[in-house]
């Protein structure tokens, strides 16, 4: 097969984006990195977002870490997902930072979570630690939007979690709350505190939180589309 080339500007259509992603399928991260002059780190301990950055280069992504989607003109978000040898997700998937203040009037329809999950390009990548990072292969991409049932499930979880935040119960939220969507602390160190609402309506300082998709949600999603048993 002819060697793929990175997109030098953002893709103009979903078809172009998907076609480019399909070209990467089967290549190792080391091969893709070498083709664009990147050095593959030994592991992801200090470079947690490295795989995402590499694929953004190949796919012509535009957003960086800005709040809009990675492919803003198309309204598509890129999510890499580490999978085991059976194609099952190995970890939860970060969606966006959870807003802990200023939430009056926010609805599911206008929420950042729904905005980020409206249209997602999922790219599975081999993630088992026994495989050296440079030798991990990129899998077949999937362009996905939540169906009615998935949207309902995510909405219910989001509403439950946001109610707890608004009612000053952020410190009581655990990873077990929510069936498919969870909230967890998201901070590189325990000193990075942010404002939130306390139990009596007062301002408190707490760790920043992030919304994550649980593995049971992404596992069912991948299994349904790739017919994994």
From Swiss-Prot:
Record InterPro entries: DNA_mismatch_repair_MutH, DNA_rep_MutH/RE_typeII_Sau3AI, DNA_rep_MutH/T2_RE_sf, Restrct_endonuc-II-like
Domain of life: Bacteria
One GO term (biological process): mismatch repair
Keywords: Cytoplasm, DNA damage, DNA repair, Endonuclease, Hydrolase, Nuclease
A GO molecular-function descriptor: endonuclease activity
GO CC aspect terms: cytoplasm; mismatch repair complex
Subcellular location: Cytoplasm
NCBIfam families: mutH_TIGR (TIGR02248), PRK05070.1 (NF003458)
Family, as annotated: Belongs to the MutH family.
Role: Sequence-specific endonuclease that cleaves unmethylated GATC sequences. It is involved in DNA mismatch repair.
Protein name: DNA mismatch repair protein MutH
